[in-house]
Every structure is written in C-alpha cells, then in structure tokens.
A protein has these predicted regions:
Chain A
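A structural signal for multi-pass alpha-helical bundles of membrane permease subunits
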Residues: 4-5, 10-277
C-alpha cells in the first residue's frame, strides 16, 4: 500500500519534472514565434515582450514574397524525401547484412563504413564536388540527392537495431524455405519498425535542414532549397529578423508533421517499462 | 527473495544468448556471401561519394594546394606546420573539451528523457513533440536564437537576475564562452538521442519484461537486468555517434563567437574550414582533418571494444 | 501516407532526370552577388537587352565566398561575381580574376578612369597596375552619436562631439549610465563581433600614429611597433582608463553590430553609411553622424571598404566584353544604389548629382563622402584574414583580459610572421 502511494507520488513528480523540462526546451522556440509576429525594430527589444502590442501577421506573407519560397519548399521536400527513401532502403539492407551474416572481412567493412563519419564535410567538399561535376550532376536534383542517399549513420543505427532481433526468428523462417530477401522483407522489416521510424525522422530532418551541400551544388533559383532561401534573407541590405523568424517557424512545420506521423512507430506496443505494477 | 536472485542470474544469460548475433553454425556456407550482397549497394555508393573523396583529401594532405593553382607535393610539411602552430593545438583541445562536454551529459540525459517519454502520462504525445522541437529547429536559426538568448541583456541573464545572480556576459569571457556553446549542444542533442533511445526501448519485446515481472523483479532490477542489456546495441550507437556528431559542430561558433574570445571556441572543424576556405591552404586543412580522423577512428574503436567487453557480442 | 511519399519520390526523381541537361544558352551572362538591389538593375537590363540576358543569383554573405572559391577551383563560377575589397589580393595572387578593361567602359586608360572617381577610391582594387574589380558602392566608417544622450549629459551635439580618440574617452565617460556597479549604458563602444571590424579600427589608428601593420614588402609584421602599441592603447584606455565602455557587452550583441545604438544601449558608435538605412528615419532623427575620430584631426585617416564586381577569367574575350557592358549599366546607376542601400558611390561627382541636395542635408552624405575621401583600404595582403584574426585575438587579450598591449602585439606579430612565411 505504502509502496503504491510512493510510486504514484513518484509518477506525479516525474510528470511535473517533464513539464518543467518542456518549458526549458521550448523557450527558444517561443522566442522565435514571438519574434515572427513583431516589427523588425521590436525583435531585439529587451526586456522581452512575449506578445507584442500589435501582432504583425503580415510578416508571414511578406517573408514568403521575398523569394521563390514555393519552389524552395518543394525542392526541400523532394530532396528530403528522396534522401530519406535512399537511407531507409540502403541503410537497412546494409545494416541487416552487417548484423546477421558472417562474411569475410565483415568487421573491416563495418569499420570502413563507420570511418566515413569521421571527416568533416568541409574537407571532402571539393573532391565530392568534383565527383558530382564529373557525373554531370551540378545544379540538378541528382546532384543534390545522390551524395547524401546513403549515410553511415543510418547503416550503424540499423545494424545495432537489427542485432536485437533474435536469430531464432530468422532460423525458423529459413527452415520454412523463405528466401533471403523474403526474410528481410517479412521478418527483419516488421521487427525493426521503431528504428526505421527514427531513421526516417532523422534523415528527413537532417536533409530538410541541409545547407552547405545544396549551397555548393545549386546555383540557380529553381534548385535552391529552403535553408538557402532562409540564409539569403540575411543579405547585407536588410537584416529582417522578424521575417527570418517567420520563415523559420514555417520551416519547422514539415519536420513537426513528420515527427507526429512517425511517432506511432515508437508508441506502438506500449509500454511496460514504467508502470503496471 | 530466492526467486529474485534467480531472475538476476538467468535472465541476462538468456538474453545474452538471444542477443548474440552471428556464430550460428547452422548458417549454410552459401549464406556467407549473401550478407555481403546486402551491404554491397551501400558500399558502392560510399566508395563513389565518400571513400574516393576521402582518399583525395588524404593525398592532398601531402601537397600545398590553394584550391586555384595546381597542387605542389611537399611531403610531410603540412603536418610539420600544424605541429608548430599553437593555434592548431588550441583548436584540438577545444574540440576535445567540447566533444566530451556535450556527449557525456547526452548519454545520461537522453536515456532519462527516453525512459520518461516511454511512460504513460497525461498529454504524452504533446510532451514528446515539445521535446522534439529543438531538433526540428533549423541549425542556422538555433545559432541566431541562442546568440540572442546569451546577449548581456538577453533572456538567460534576465532569468538569472530574477534569482539574484548578476549579469554574465556569456560569450565574451574565456571562462564561459565554451560552456555556453556546450549547453546548446546538449540542448539540441538530448532530443536527438532521446528519439533513438526511445526506438530502442520500444523494440524490447514485452515478453522479457513480463517474464521479469512474473519472476518478481522490481523496477530497478528490470532496468539493470532487462532494459540495459537489451538496450546495449543502442547505447553503443549513442555513445559513438554522440561523440562523432558533437565533434563536427561548426556553425554555432562561426555565427555566435567567430571562434573567440581569444580562440577559446575555435573548434577543429572551424579551424579546418578556415584554413582551407578562408586562408586557401587546403593541404594544411586536409592534414588537420587527417589528425582529427585518426583521433576519432581510434576513439571509436576503443569505444566499440570496451562496449563489446561489457557484454554485447 | 506511403502513397504520398512514393509519388513525391517519383516526381523528384523524374524532375531530376528532366532538369539535368544544363540550360545551354547562347550569350546568357551569369552573375553571383549578395545584394537584392542588383536584382532590379538586372530586370531593367534584361528588358533593354533581350539578346544578352543576365541571370542574377543571390547568395547569403558568409558562405558565399566559400561557394565562390569552390566554384573557381572547379572552373564552374559565374561570368561575373561580387567580391569584398580585402579578399582581392588572395584572388589576384592566384590569377583567378580577369582584369577590368577601362577602355571597354569608355575611359582612355586606368589613369583617366581614376580621375572620374574620388581620389584613392579605386586603390583597393588595383594590383600591379591593373584594375581587377569595379565598385558600385564605397563605404567608410563615421561616428554616430545619440543627440538625446548628449543633451541629457549637458553637452551640445553640434559643438561638443569628439574629434580625437581622447575626446571619445573623455566625452564617452560623461555619457555612461550606471546602475550599481553595472554599466547599463555605454558612452562609446567598438564593435567586437568580427575580426575584420577590429582590423578596420586598428589599421586606421596605427596609420593615424604613422605606422603600418606590415612593412613595404608585405613580409614582416610591424604591428608591435610604437605606433601599434599606441593604437592598441586607444582601445585599452577607452575601456579601462576612461571606463567609457564595457567591452564584454558588445561581443555578444546580435547580428547587427550597430544595433546597440538605436536601442539606446550605447551613446556613440562607429559604423558605416549603410546603417542609416538600417536604423530608419525615426532613429536618424536623433542620431547625428560626425567624422571618424582621429589622433590628429589635421592629418585625418579613415577606413574605407567596398564591394566590387569581378570578371571570371575563364570565359572568352567576347563574353568578357559583353560582361563589361553589364558592368557599365550597373555602376552607372549610382543613385538607385544609394537610395536603396544608403551606400555612396565612389564617383567624384556623386554629391552633385541631381536630387542629392536633400540627402546631403538629411542623411549626412557630406560627412560620409568626406570620410571616404580621407579613406585608406585595409592592409593589402593575401593573408589578410590571418592578419585580422591575429590582431583580433591580441585586442581581446588586451581589452578583455587586460594584458599588456606590447606583449599581446608581440604574440600577434609572431603569429602573423608565421602566416606570412607560408607560401
């Protein structure tokens, strides 16, 4: 009995703590939203006024009119979804191969793949650009997407997650005469949904926000992505922070939707870790 | 009581058997190469877009190359120049401090966050979304927003002042500039790795917890004997990746401090970027990258080895 | 949702295939810049010259030079592009800029062309007797003062404004506002956010004391000379002797370095002509612009800088000629530039253009142009960014950590000499 009340009290405390954390996490975000409905002069006013006297909704249409943002958003969607797709397919395949098979030099393969995470993009920028140029992909969607379509991050994540899947399941399917790809499709994929969800989410977000690479590859307006549009608002003539913030708010919406969509992947099969005493 | 001890001893070994991948003699020999074919598409891609450029960068580290005139072979000169450059040494240690300063808190806080969000509580999906927001924020916006938060008259100081703590000019003092940037790294990293932990927690089959409950295991016992061992692959991933992603930070110091004051926030990627693209010494930048590469590669191998000894494989 | 994803994937890939073959136009001229103002000029040009259309692409400032470098190194840069003056030596040393031909712009030669400009205004773009970029704007720095704060302190902004650095410290001290031990309003402050700004101040002050950052060959650092130490002491004295500023405050300020002035957090601040447009007419009502402070007002030296248009050397001569026509169109419209950006044009007759009388009265054009005509460009060196950073670090040590100026500059010179020794 006493233990139960203790637990319940603990639960309430944890919830309170979680709510407090939410505020800390969101504080910068509130500032961003609040700035997006101020006038340019008010943005950096201190002390902060969270809700301005005169709310400037007009910042949103004004900001959108400053560039071909319809095009930028579309391009970002295309790039983010294509790269996400590439990552889901290739990283999962590779992760499965690395987690559940023993082929010669498997560890070497894994380490090589991992090693690609260890050089900053700046240093491979010019050599990578040369590869893309020689493939004739400068200023094309192909050039924006191809070099990012596989990321060692995803291979590593999927390898680690697929390791959790019991071998007995795979063995059983193999006994039943399931093909190797069939095993992948029917056993592995359904069993690593949470990780796939995380990978999809993070790949989308990373590439929605990708800046340096598109900046180098895209030279014309019709191929620029959203972050490039955002960055070019900060020209020397005008530093319109209220409008930049309005765009930034809009730029977060897709990622938030993707999160809500993939959240189900994490939530499914809830949840024993905490309660149910 | 006796049953609980039984849980402690048997469960981990059962799990260990289940988790242990590979080593299955029952795999037919033709299967040996099947795995390779699963890896092949990714490998081909990485060879073209990653390994080849990396090899080029390695080669460049032995050349003098200003990006615009043809490269000139200079042997180990670039490495020698770096060794003699106190600014390189400074950047290296700034990066090491930043890397561990950000990732070690991330390991624990992210796990705590994932455990928290995995609980049943009112408004959970809203809370989850709220915690996720920092990673949805565009990097450039993060830098802009936090620069303003750290302003001498900014939000952080306003909050501190209500607690009676005086104004701290975060970004303009050598003592506080790097910690201020580390705080942003943690703020942004916790939700990211929290999501990955959450996925890992969700993948733990219910049966293990149910079995443990039937055996009478308490919350902590289940955490240490079920959750942690089963989460080890994910923990390994987070420990390795948090270091690798922390060390790449670059935009925040660029936008917020320009590497200052007195070079105390000039992380190595910033040094590399600047040497290559601002000072036009690509060879030296490549050499600095190789130093970073070897350091990170060694660190990762050690981590993987230690974690394996900890009982995953 | 899955179908939605798939369709988008397909659309993306298809578009990728369709768009791939680059547009192969006959004489389309490409231009990379970083200013919105140029867009309208391009639109106007395209209307008049449908046969040689210009495609203008706009890029954000900071990473723009990186893109430019990557593009020049792979020979995929635009036909013409914008550059900031102090980066020129880095590019000319590597032969990646085509010389500007004065004869194609309607001048007899470079000497003839110089006569049409404010004296010295083209110097920053000349290398070994050839012009490598054409500036559509020129900018210097002048002192902006808050007249309200002056009157509050019992000072007359029209008579009592500072002429020398000592004046800045002395008057600045009177404008400071304290709350307890904390400075809530600075009398004066230098921007601390950027090593280039630091160098603009320092390079100018060292010249005011008769010194230079580098020797004539450009291979040896002279910043730790007597003049250099004096110049560094100017900053140290304003902060520590007069206590007219709190140097820790301005490093963390937001992306607009001059923003503390319209916010009333600082009473005097040095900034460029573009700030007039940024502050807006409401603020400019109580802000007055006076000349850049000097060591000796009789021998004035001020900083000057500019953005300029350069030509890609990898294109054919015929195309270069076509680019020059565009250049001419762009720089000839100095009035539009001025109205949009508040940056004056380095044209000698700029002040006498029709319609300028008003700006001379209300927008302090006379002050700016006078300061510009005393202006000298930043130390020319292909290692300029390393110079800037070494001096910036030295300044941070002096101003934030109260290190001795001489000692700090000695260390900076060691760093600079090491950089200069590298090829």
């Amino acid at each position: 009995m006493r233990r139960k009340t203790m637990l319940r009290l603990g639960g309430a405390l944890i919830t309170l703590f979680a709510l407090f954390g939410v505020w800390v996490m969101l504080l910068p975000y509130f500032w961003m939203v609040s700035s997006s409905i101020k006038t340019g002069i008010e943005v950096f006013d201190l002390p902060i006024k969270w809700i301005p006297d005169d709310i400037q909704w007009v910042n949103y249409p004004n900001a959108l009119a400053k560039g071909a943002f319809g095009v930028y958003f579309y391009n970002s969607f295309v790039v983010a979804f294509a790269v996400m797709g590439g990552n889901l397919v290739f990283c999962t395949l590779a992760g499965y191969g690395l987690a559940k098979f023993r082929f010669p030099h498997r560890e070497l393969c894994f380490r090589l793949i991992l090693s690609t995470l260890m050089l900053p993009l700046e240093i491979v920028l010019v050599p990578t650009f040369l590869v893309v140029r020689d493939l004739g992909l400068v200023n094309t969607y192909g050039g924006l997407i191809a070099p990012l379509a596989v990321d060692a991050f995803g291979v590593f994540l999927m390898r680690q997650s697929i390791r959790d899947i019991p071998d007995s399941l795979i063995e059983a399917a193999r006994m039943d005469g399931c093909s190797e790809f069939g095993i992948f499709w029917r056993i592995i994929l359904p069993n690593c949904k949470p990780a796939l969800g995380a990978l999809a989410l993070l790949a989308f977000r990373d590439n929605w926000d990708q800046f340096l690479w598109p900046f180098i590859v895209a030279t014309t307006d019709n191929l620029k992505t959203f972050p490039l549009g955002l960055a070019q608002m900060e020209g020397i003539d005008s530093a319109a922070y209220h409008e930049i913030m309005a765009l930034a708010v809009m730029g977060m919406i897709p990622a938030a939707f993707i999160f809500l969509f993939f959240q189900r992947a994490f939530v499914r099969g809830i949840t024993l870790t905490g309660l149910k005493e | 009581m006796g049953r609980e001890i039984g849980v402690d001893r048997t469960l981990p070994s059962k799990i260990r058997r289940l988790v242990a991948g590979g080593g299955k003699r029952s795999l037919h020999s033709h299967l040996r190469w099947a795995g390779f074919f699963f890896v092949l598409p990714a490998l081909i891609h990485l060879i073209i877009f990653k390994f080849y450029p990396m090899l080029q960068a390695f080669r460049l580290s032995f050349y003098r190359y200003d990006l615009m005139s043809p490269p000139v072979f200079t042997g180990l000169e670039n490495y020698n120049l770096l060794w003699q450059n106190p600014l390189f040494h400074q950047s290296f240690w700034v990066s090491v401090k930043y890397m561990f300063g950000v990732s070690i808190p991330e390991w624990f806080f992210a796990l705590a966050l994932a455990l928290l969000l995995n609980r049943r509580m009112p408004g959970r999906s809203v809370i989850r979304l709220a915690y996720f927001f920092p990673i949805a924020m565009s990097q450039i916006v993060v830098a802009m927003v936090w620069k303003f938060m750290y302003h001498p008259y900014g939000l952080v100081n306003t909050i501190l002042e209500t607690f009676g703590i005086g104004r701290i000019n975060w970004l303009s003092m050598e003592e506080s500039a790097l910690p201020a940037l580390i705080a942003i790294g943690i703020w942004r990293g916790i939700p990211l790795f929290g999501v990955i932990y959450l996925a890992g927690l969700q993948a733990i089959p219910k049966e293990y917890h149910e079995a443990a409950i039937i055996d009478g295991a308490g919350v902590f016992q289940r955490f240490f004997y079920v959750t942690i061992p089963l989460l080890l692959p994910t923990i390994t991933f987070v420990m390795v990746l948090s270091l690798l992603s922390a060390v790449k930070v670059f935009l925040n110091p660029l936008v917020m401090t320009e590497g200052g004051p007195n070079g105390t926030t000039k992380v190595l990627p910033y040094f590399i970027y600047e040497t290559g693209f601002a000072f036009f010494r690509m060879g030296e930048a490549a050499a600095a990258s190789m130093v970073l590469f070897v350091f990170l590669f060694g660190l990762t191998l050690i981590q993987l080895r230690l974690l394996r000894r900890g009982g995953v494989e | 949702m899955r179908r939605f994803l798939m369709t988008h994937l397909l659309v993306g890939l298809l578009t990728a295939l369709l768009v791939s073959p680059a547009f192969a136009q006959q004489t389309r001229i490409t231009w990379w810049g970083h200013s919105n103002c140029s867009k309208d000029l391009v639109a106007e040009w395209n209307k008049k010259n449908p046969n040689t259309p210009v495609q203008y692409d706009f890029f954000a400032m900071t990473p723009y030079f990186q893109k430019l470098t990557a593009a020049l190194s792979t020979r995929s840069a635009a036909d013409m592009f914008t550059l900031i003056d102090f980066l020129l030596p880095g590019f000319t040393a590597k032969n990646v800029l085509a010389p500007i031909r004065p004869e194609w712009l309607g001048y007899k030669d470079l000497e003839d062309m110089k006569k049409a400009y404010i004296p010295g205004a083209l110097d920053g773009y000349i290398h070994k007797g050839k012009l490598y970029a054409l500036p559509p704007i020129a900018s210097g720095f002048s002192l902006f003062i808050n007249t309200k704060h002056f009157r509050e302190a019992g000072l007359d902004p029209d008579k009592d404004y500072p002429r020398t650095w000592e004046d800045v410290g002395r008057i600045g001290k009177k404008l400071v506002k304290m709350r307890g031990s904390r400075m809530v309003r600075e009398g004066f402050d230098f921007a601390m956010h950027s090593s280039t700004w630091t160098m603009w101040y320092f390079n100018t002050t060292i010249r005011q004391y008769g010194g230079e950052i580098l020797d004539a060959s450009g291979k040896k650092c002279l910043a730790n000379s007597e003049a250099g130490v004096k110049a560094m002491n100017v900053r140290a004295r304003i902060a520590h002797h007069y206590k007219a500023s709190d140097p820790t405050v301005s490093l963390g300020t937001n992306a607009l370095p001059a923003d503390d002035l319209p916010k009333g957090r600082v009473s005097m601040f040095i900034t460029h002509a573009g700030s007039v447009a940024q502050f807006g007419p409401k603020v400019m009502k109580y802000v007055k612009v006076v000349p850049f402070p000097q060591v000796d007002p009789k021998k004035p030296v001020t900083p000057i800088y500019g953005f300029a248009l350069a030509v890609n050397p990898h294109i054919s001569e015929a195309k270069q000629r076509a680019v020059h026509k565009v250049l001419k169109h762009v720089v000839n419209d100095s009035k539009t530039w001025y109205e949009r950006t508040s940056y004056p044009h380095p044209d000698k007759n700029f002040l006498n253009l029709p319609g300028m009388e008003d700006a001379r009265k209300t927008r302090y054009l006379d002050v700016f142009v006078k300061d510009i005509s005393n202006g000298r460009f930043l130390q020319r060196s292909d290692k300029v960014l390393e110079l800037n950073q070494a001096i910036h670090r030295a300044m941070e040590r002096v101003v934030l950590k109260k290190e001795d100026s001489k000692k700090s500059l000695d260390r900076a010179c060691k760093e600079i000499d090491a950089a200069l020794a590298k090829k």
